[in-house]
């Protein structure tokens, strides 16, 4: 990631979450989220847009945390593009991805009329600042250790993390 930033690439940090409540079955939630993620990644429009913007790869981490509303499954994704995206391109991309995530969650049976409003507020969050130090601090949950090795450890470690606030309002307490 550090090399990508040095080469002038754009890093876009996205959090995807799904509606949930205390009584939900964890395995069912995870299966439905997996279905939504598969639907999210499919489609010619997605492929064309990502190619047009110079998409080179991503890092995805599934993170189930537990809070007052039960299990809170969500993913953190870092999208990497081989050039600096314009503000207009970033806005178009994040708008498209947010809409695509909602449609995928509806199709997977996760979003209903009852929980749609909450999903609209918490279901998708994009940090478009490109602040690599902020990203590393958040992903490692360690204000003192700002290292790429710490980020790599965070992205690959399956251990659950403590409840907390995320980037740009990601509420890991499970309000979505």
Predicted regions: what is each one?
Residues 1-75, 79-176:
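Catalytic residues for metal-mediated phosphoryl-transfer on nucleic acids/nucleotides
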């Amino acid at each position: 990631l550090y090399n990508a930033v040095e080469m002038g690439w754009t890093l876009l940090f996205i959090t995807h979450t799904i509606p949930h409540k205390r009584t939900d079955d964890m395995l069912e939630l995870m299966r439905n989220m997996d279905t939504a993620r598969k639907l999210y990644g499919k489609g010619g429009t997605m492929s064309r847009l990502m190619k047009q913007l110079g998409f080179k790869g991503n890092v995805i981490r599934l993170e189930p945390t537990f809070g007052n509303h039960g299990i809170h499954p969500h993913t953190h994704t870092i999208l990497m593009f081989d050039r600096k995206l314009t503000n207009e391109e970033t806005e178009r991309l994040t708008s498209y991805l947010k809409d695509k995530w909602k449609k995928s969650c509806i199709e997977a049976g996760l979003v209903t009329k009852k929980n749609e409003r909450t999903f609209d507020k918490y279901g998708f969050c994009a940090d478009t600042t490109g602040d690599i130090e902020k990203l590393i601090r958040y992903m490692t949950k360690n204000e003192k250790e700002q290292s790429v090795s710490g980020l790599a450890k965070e992205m690959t470690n399956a251990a659950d993390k403590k409840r907390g606030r995320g980037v740009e309002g990601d509420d890991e307490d499970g309000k979505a």
